[in-house]
């Protein structure tokens, strides 16, 4: 194990030098073991943000977090997909990736959705699901078995990564995106086989895709949406990296290449007289605004691709629309709610 002092590692970061495998792991272990003072943590997080975390740093730190997270029962022998992204795009859109999780599950994908409450002003996935009656504190056994019995589950991050709870107030006080925003989507305790991961900044595309690849993800799409969304947008060019069996491929996704209607990102913003919960419910029931339903269908089509269910984006889009038109995603939601109640 590296015997570098915390101050030496901090100096390395402040000079813009990347951390090697061992030092990245040591830094995370020290966080987990409460061996870093709060003032040092603030400095580390700021230095890492200024330098920019590499795929190697992210994958090594994520693996240490996962090693510290023990499952109470065996991982289900299923091909699972997560839709957790970095968040923090500041767009005040409704919870698109949360809606996508239920729609994709209704289309036959086993969804292991990892999420948290908001660290900013926006309502996080855990906030909206809790407000709609999902029990975030269900037994861990139940949370895991739900994906086998229902086809979807929700893993509330603080329940699984308790050692990081003490960092939450400091992260909030800093008021900036930190490396933990990037680590969140990488540390799903069920270690899904595939993922659609939205990033709030274009410069996160390559390190996040590289981290997923280094961690052995079978298939993934990392997407930075037009206008700064951390989801695929219906308005313009979406920058994408496909991760497929060890290979990374950069691409551009624009709805003008398909038979989709162009829609402004502004139509996805939650206004003062709307609630995140009502929008999510209406989308899952297929009764929501067309812009909301269409953007969920677009992003669901990406999930269907990584899951190997639908290779054609347009067909995936139509499959998602059909599912919502029959309110099947809402049925999935109600099933999960009932399952986790006890």
UniProtKB/Swiss-Prot annotation:
Cofactor stoichiometry and binding remark:
Binds 2 magnesium ions per monomer.
Organism for this UniProt entry = Prochlorococcus marinus (strain MIT 9515)
- Indicate the segments annotated as coiled coil, or none if absent: none
Q: How does it assemble?
A: Homodimer.
Amino acids binding anthranilate 2? 171
Q: Where does Mg(2+) 1 bind?
A: 97, 231
**Cofactor(s) annotated in UniProt:** Mg(2+)
Q: A Pfam family in this protein?
A: Glycos_transf_3
Q: Is Transferase among the key words of this record?
A: yes
Q: Which residues bind anthranilate 1?
A: 85, 116
Q: Name the EC number(s).
A: 2.4.2.18
HAMAP family, A to Z: TrpD
N-terminal signal peptide: none
In Swiss-Prot or TrEMBL terms, this protein is called Anthranilate phosphoribosyltransferase
Residues binding Mg(2+) 2 are: 230-231
Q: Which gene encodes it?
A: trpD
The reaction(s) catalysed by this protein are: N-(5-phospho-beta-D-ribosyl)anthranilate + diphosphate = 5-phospho-alpha-D-ribose 1-diphosphate + anthranilate
Its UniProt pathway annotation is: Amino-acid biosynthesis; L-tryptophan biosynthesis; L-tryptophan from chorismate: step 2/5
One GO BP on record is: L-tryptophan biosynthetic process
Q: Which NCBIfam families match?
A: trpD
- Role of this protein: Catalyzes the transfer of the phosphoribosyl group of 5-phosphorylribose-1-pyrophosphate (PRPP) to anthranilate to yield N-(5'-phosphoribosyl)-anthranilate (PRA).
**Looking at the UniProt record for this protein, which Gene Ontology cellular component terms does it annotate, in alphabetical order?**
cytosol
- Report the superkingdom from the record: Bacteria
Family membership, please give it.
Belongs to the anthranilate phosphoribosyltransferase family.
One GO MF term: anthranilate phosphoribosyltransferase activity
């Amino acid at each position: 194990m590296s015997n570098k002092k915390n101050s030496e590692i901090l100096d390395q970061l402040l000079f813009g030098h990347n951390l090697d495998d061992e030092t990245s792991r040591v830094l995370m272990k020290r966080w987990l073991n409460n061996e870093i003072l709060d003032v040092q943590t603030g400095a580390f997080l700021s230095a890492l943000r200024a330098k920019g975390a590499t795929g190697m740093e992210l994958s090594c730190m994520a693996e240490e977090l996962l090693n510290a997270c023990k499952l109470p029962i065996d991982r289900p022998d299923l091909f699972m997909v997560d839709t957790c992204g970095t968040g923090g795009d500041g767009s005040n859109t409704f919870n698109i990736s949360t809606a996508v999780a239920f729609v994709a599950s209704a289309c036959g994908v086993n969804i292991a959705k990892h999420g948290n409450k908001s660290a900013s002003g926006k309502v996080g996935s855990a906030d909206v699901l809790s407000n709609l009656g999902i029990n975030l504190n269900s037994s861990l056994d139940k949370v895991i078995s739900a994906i086998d019995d229902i086809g979807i589950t929700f893993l509330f991050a603080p329940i699984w990564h308790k050692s990081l709870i003490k960092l939450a107030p400091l992260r909030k006080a800093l008021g900036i995106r930190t490396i933990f925003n990037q680590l969140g989507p990488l540390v799903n305790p069920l270690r899904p086989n595939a993922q659609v991961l939205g990033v709030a900044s274009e410069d996160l595309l390559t390190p996040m895709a590289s981290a997923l690849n280094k961690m052995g993800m079978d298939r993934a799409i990392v997407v930075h949406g037009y206008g700064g969304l951390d989801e695929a947008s219906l308005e313009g060019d979406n920058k994408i990296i496909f991760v497929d069996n060890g290979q990374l491929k950069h691409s551009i996704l624009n709805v003008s290449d398909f038979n989709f209607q162009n829609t402004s990102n502004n139509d996805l913003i939650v206004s003062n007289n709307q609630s995140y919960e009502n929008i999510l419910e209406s989308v899952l029931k297929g009764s929501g605004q067309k812009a909301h339903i269409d953007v969920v269908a677009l992003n669901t089509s990406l999930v269907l691709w990584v899951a190997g269910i639908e290779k054609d984006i347009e067909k995936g889009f139509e499959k998602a629309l059909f599912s919502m038109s029959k309110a099947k995603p809402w049925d999935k939601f109600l099933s999960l709610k009932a399952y986790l109640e006890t």
